[in-house]
């Protein structure tokens, strides 16, 4: 999928991301579906001991990491945690030295920092989609996340 790597002209990429976890914490997986024009790429991965929120973050991080050049990216996520983190909370966390409003360390800070770095490479728009509501891209990302989780469980 060479064309999904971006052509340097700010290619438009649509990205659907999802995370899944059994037990929370427990085995988890992440999935990404990317489309640029007629080209499509899917990715998934997982960890043996993780949380749903960590897998939601990993999906977006890995999806953006796969783009080798700056692109215009629309990210479709069903995660309020990722959506609010990037659109509402991030600026304040950074201003407070990665602390929450009640001065506690931000959970999953290394993933938020990695995501912030990846987002900085691209022009990103965020779109929230209701999970398990028939959005075809979200359904595929969910299936990929479950594949990642099953692989992490050793099945």
UniProtKB/Swiss-Prot annotation:
Binds 1 Mg(2+) ion per subunit. May bind a second metal ion at a regulatory site, or after substrate binding. Mg(2+) 1 binds at residues 18, 56, 78. CDD domains: RNase_HI_prokaryote_like. One of its GO terms (biological process) is DNA replication, removal of RNA primer. It is an enzyme of class 3 (hydrolase). Its main location: cytoplasm. One of its GO terms (cellular component) is cytoplasm. Keywords: Cytoplasm, Endonuclease, Hydrolase, Magnesium, Metal-binding, Nuclease. It catalyses: Endonucleolytic cleavage to 5'-phosphomonoester. It is found in: Cytoplasm. Its EC number is 3.1.26.4. One of its GO terms (molecular function) is nucleic acid binding. Its cofactor is Mg(2+). Mg(2+) 2 binds at residues 18, 142. Residues 9-150 form the RNase H type-1 domain. PROSITE patterns: RNASE_H_1 (PS50879). PANTHER family: RIBONUCLEASE H1. Belongs to the RNase H family. Monomer. NCBIfam families: PRK00203.1. Endonuclease that specifically degrades the RNA of RNA-DNA hybrids. This is Ribonuclease H. The lineage of its organism: Bacteria, Pseudomonadati, Pseudomonadota, Betaproteobacteria, Burkholderiales.
